[in-house]
């Protein structure tokens, strides 16, 4: 198998991304960490974060060993799976966990340095926080491309000269996405439960009952709250987007192998095209990172503009570069496919802007929630829920338009629904997802920046650095809240396109599983013609007809209902988990205020360790059931309802999960920034009736935006990945 010379750009981009991440890490570490008090607080947070991560990885390791043994049984005993799957699964989980580890290590070292830099200037604080966030962004894309390039080279050597080699290679590579998805779900759910248990506990007792400021060192839950920002928003988000990034590239490669199956040379070009777009995106992300800077006294809009310059210029350049890449590759309909990529990029920008509109206190929706605080917490909750529901409209319509346009651009606006037209159109949807995620190096940097700035503000408050420094860190923190909300919108949008591409890839995996079953002596009879069905020559419409995938089939309808229900079931379980953990935290903080004399007067030091322990134990205990449920549902549906039921499940999960995720993320973000707006002196300012009402809204919104909402991105992708990996089992036993 001849691998084109252009492919080598992928491992080169991977090495450069990891090298630049290391350079940014060294630059951050060379900055001064500040006063002894600042170092001490940063040390507490770092110790708590790393202790949690070690504990989480220990639990996840047991799950991975169990799943790898099941996959080995399926591959080597039952013979219903490719023998490389157990190994691919493990590497996907390993690299995802590694990205989270490096990101969190960087974030915990960066917070005190950001606060210290903010003592001198706003720009100094912004640069350290943003470049530290870039370590996470570049580590994710670097490790993702390294994993993809490594597996592609190994499998190309193993399967060279075989019939359907590229289809086998790409569908096998897809399975390492399940490893990444599983690790991501544990990171998101566990981290989300940890951070929100601490946050809710700190807010209810500290702000509402004891009337002390946020991040006050007298609050026993403060350190746990700061640790939680790292485990939830850095390690969790990194693992989530690592999975989307790899999933979009691999599913598009698999769809390309199918779309151009009759033209070997063109097939190879279609397979490496998404990898090359992602590789060029690395270079342009690095360029964009260097463009981010600001001036002293910058307003919120100035800060947003400085970040937007970096991300938007990177996106603009990757759009232009895509035309050149696909033209030089000589790929069929290169112009249409380039416009599909642009469609994905534009969709990402629109979803980001819509999220900013509904969650930033620079705009009316959040301002109205702040104003509702004047009449109490009930109206704040009602307004927030309404805002979250309204905010689903633009992202859903945007994704719908992006799906249609990318599909039609890629198949040359062929509306005949022929097999070739469908396969080319689906490839276009996949490559649109790659386009949306191609500048992940910088978009994830803006997201990881948020918790670093938040921790810097906490460090400044606990170290009592003075009003001017706190004002600067507050400005950076407010920007971080908006970038985090925008990043969540971006993550949800990319998850929807990736899940749709994975849905199409599932049919290809079923095809491979059926061919394997035929080689073992099994025969498939078409239910309508009663003739022997040959999957090797079958097209996408043929499979839909064979498995009777239509709305009149009750198996499909039942699958759709189960998929939609799964999203709500998952959210309910994670919300309840946060509620239970937060109750324990509230009781512990109240106990310390009651029993340790002198805490509120600042004469005694709270027991921070007990609160960290409560969050850690709760996260480990509560994350297992919802995470394992996400793995179990597709397997059970596959065996009971077959392929038609699984396709219904994935469609229902995608539609229900996407809409619910947007609602929860945006409602939570709006409540958070409504509280921030009041704290800036509006509607009575800190300590006022409106402030206490918006704190209640923010507390309700915390698990919305940081636990349940973001976890849904991974749920919809993980269900697709599990279905793909278990395709052989579904074909054999359904």
Q: Language-model features: where?
A:
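Hydrophobic packing and interface segments
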Residues: 1-734
């Amino acid at each position: 198998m001849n691998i084109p010379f252009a492919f080598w750009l992928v491992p080169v981009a991977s090495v450069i991304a990891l090298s630049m991440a290391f350079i940014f890490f060294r630059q951050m570490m060379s900055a001064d960490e500040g006063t002894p008090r600042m170092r001490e607080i940063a040390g507490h947070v770092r110790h708590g974060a790393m202790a949690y991560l070690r504990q989480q990885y220990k639990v996840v390791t047991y799950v991975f060993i169990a799943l790898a043994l099941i996959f080995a049984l399926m591959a080597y005993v039952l013979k219903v799976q490719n023998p490389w799957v157990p190994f691919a699964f493990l590497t996907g989980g390993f690299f995802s966990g590694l990205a989270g580890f490096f990101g969190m290590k960087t974030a915990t070292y960066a917070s005190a340095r950001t606060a210290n830099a903010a003592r001198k200037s706003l720009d100094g604080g912004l640069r350290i926080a943003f470049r530290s966030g870039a370590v996470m962004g570049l580590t994710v894309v670097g490790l993702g491309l390294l994993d993809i390039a490594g597996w592609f080279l190994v499998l190309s050597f193993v399967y060279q000269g075989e019939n359907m080699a590229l289809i086998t290679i790409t569908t096998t590579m897809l399975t390492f996405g399940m490893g990444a998805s599983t690790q991501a779900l544990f990171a998101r759910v566990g981290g989300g439960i940890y951070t929100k248990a601490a946050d809710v506990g700190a807010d209810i007792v500290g702000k509402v009952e004891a009337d002390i400021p946020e991040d006050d060192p007298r609050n026993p839950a403060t350190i746990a709250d700061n640790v939680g920002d790292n485990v939830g928003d850095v390690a969790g988000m990194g693992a989530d987007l690592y999975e989307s990034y790899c999933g979009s590239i691999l599913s598009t490669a698999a769809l390309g192998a199918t779309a151009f199956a009759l033209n070997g040379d063109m097939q190879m070009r279609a397979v490496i095209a998404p990898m090359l777009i992602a590789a060029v995106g690395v270079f342009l992300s690095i360029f964009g990172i260097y463009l981010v800077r600001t001036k002293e006294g910058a307003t919120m809009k100035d800060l947003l503009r400085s970040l937007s310059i970096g991300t938007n210029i990177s996106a603009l350049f990757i759009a232009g570069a895509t035309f050149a890449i696909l033209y030089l590759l000589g790929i069929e309909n290169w112009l249409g496919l380039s416009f599909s990529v642009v469609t994905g990029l534009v969709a990402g920008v629109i979803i980001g802007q819509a999220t900013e509109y509904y969650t930033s206190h620079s705009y009316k929706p959040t301002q109205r929630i702040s104003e509702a605080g004047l009449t109490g917490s009930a109206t704040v909750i009602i307004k927030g829920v309404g805002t979250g529901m309204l905010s689903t409209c633009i992202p859903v319509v945007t994704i719908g338009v992006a799906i249609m346009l990318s599909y039609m651009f890629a198949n040359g606006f062929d509306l005949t629904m022929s097999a070739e037209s469908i396969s080319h159109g689906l490839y276009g949807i996949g490559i649109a997802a790659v386009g949306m995620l191609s500048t992940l190096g910088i978009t994830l940097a803006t997201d990881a920046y948020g918790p670093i700035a938040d921790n810097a503000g906490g460090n400044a408050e606990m170290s009592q650095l003075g009003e001017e420094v706190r004002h600067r860190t507050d400005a950076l923190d407010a920007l971080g809240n908006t970038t985090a909300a925008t990043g969540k919108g971006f993550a949800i949008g990319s998850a929807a396109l990736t899940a749709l591409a994975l849905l199409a890839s599932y049919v290809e995996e079923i095809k491979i599983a059926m061919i394997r079953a035929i080689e073992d002596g099994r025969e498939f009879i078409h239910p309508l013609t009663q003739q022997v069905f040959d999957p090797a020559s079958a097209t996408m419409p043929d499979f839909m007809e064979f498995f009777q995938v239509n709305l009149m089939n009750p198996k499909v309808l039942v699958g759709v209902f189960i998929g939609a229900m799964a999203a709500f079931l998952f959210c309910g379980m994670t919300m309840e988990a946060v509620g239970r953990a937060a109750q324990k935290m509230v009781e512990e903080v109240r106990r310390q205020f009651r029993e340790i004399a002198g805490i509120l007067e600042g004469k005694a030091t709270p027991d921070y360790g007990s609160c960290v322990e409560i969050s850690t134990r709760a996260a480990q205990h509560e994350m297992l059931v919802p995470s394992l449920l996400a793995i179990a549902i597709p397997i059970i549906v596959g065996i009971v309802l077959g392929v038609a039921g699984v396709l219904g499940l994935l469609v229902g999960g995608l539609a229900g999960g996407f809409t619910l995720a947007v609602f929860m993320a945006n409602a939570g973000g709006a409540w958070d920034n409504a509280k921030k707006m009041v704290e800036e002196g509006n509607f009575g300012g800190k300590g006022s009736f409106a402030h206490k009402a918006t704190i209640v809204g923010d507390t309700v919104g915390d698990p919305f935006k940081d636990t349940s909402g973001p976890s849904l991105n991974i749920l919809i992708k993980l269900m697709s990945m599990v279905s793909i990996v278990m395709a052989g089992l579904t074909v054999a036993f359904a």
